[in-house]
């Protein structure tokens, strides 16, 4: 079975509605760093690391107690993780996705890697408590923190598949998601496992 290489960008990948070649994506990253908002700065910084010639990358956990602790990972391992996620959740080429997580942590980085590798059409927005505030679009695949999911309950009908992780999902939130008939999955993982290792 063919496995994409980390150096390749899927030809169906769209970023905010536009396709970019590898070199064009580097320019987008530079623009994010130079002129973008804070969340775009982190996205640009990650993209430059991902698109460089190295086959490895340093990552920081979403819930790491030590802000300065980073671990070096093989980029192809991240690709394999993205493919596993796509296979498990049935995320496929051309699906729409929303990036609403901070890109300075692994969860936000993985969402962008999934889009580039799986060929998703991903929209980037500033991380906030309610990512669907003033956003009327629908999405096939979204990853959120429990706080975001809680504040977006009335809007989650716009999401075909939702994964919630990065922090404890309370019983109250679990019940609310069930009552709202949201196709949601609680994920558990850590930096060392490259995103989630358990789902329910």
State where each predicted segment sits:
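AMP-binding/adenylate-forming
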Residues: 75-80, 96-151
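Conserved pre-ATP/AMP-binding loop-to-beta segment of ANL
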Residues: 40-59, 93-96
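Conserved AMP-binding A3 loop
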Residues: 55-83, 90-92
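A general structural motif
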Residues: 54-56, 93-94, 136-139, 157-159, ...
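Gly/Ser/Thr-rich phosphate-binding loop
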Residues: 153-200
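Conserved S/T- and glycine-rich ATP-binding loop of Class I adenylate-forming
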Residues: 61-62, 97, 112, 142, ...
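Conserved ATP-dependent adenylate/AMP-binding module captured primarily in the ANL superfamily
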Residues: 1-34, 79-101, 128-140
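Generic structural signal for well-ordered alpha-helical scaffold segments
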Residues: 47-48, 83-87, 149, 153
């Amino acid at each position: 079975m063919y496995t994409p290489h980390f150096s390749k960008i899927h030809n169906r990948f769209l970023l905010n509605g536009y396709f970019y070649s590898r070199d064009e994506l580097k320019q987008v990253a530079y623009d994010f760093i130079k002129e973008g908002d804070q969340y775009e700065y982190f996205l640009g910084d990650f993209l430059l690391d991902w698109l460089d010639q190295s086959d490895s990358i340093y990552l920081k956990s979403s819930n790491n107690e030590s802000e300065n602790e980073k671990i070096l990972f093989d980029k192809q391992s991240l690709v394999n993780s993205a493919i596993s996620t796509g296979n498990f959740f049935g995320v496929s080429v051309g699906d729409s996705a929303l990036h609403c997580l901070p890109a300075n942590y692994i969860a936000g980085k993985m969402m962008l890697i999934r889009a580039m590798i799986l060929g998703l059409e991903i929209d980037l927005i500033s991380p906030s408590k309610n990512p669907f505030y003033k956003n009327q679009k629908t999405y096939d695949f979204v990853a959120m923190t429990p706080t975001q999911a809680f504040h977006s309950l009335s809007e989650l009908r716009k999401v075909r598949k939702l994964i919630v992780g990065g922090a404890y999902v309370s019983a109250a939130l679990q019940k609310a998601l069930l009552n709202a008939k949201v196709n949601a999955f609680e994920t558990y993982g850590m930096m060392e496992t490259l995103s989630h290792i358990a789902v329910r």
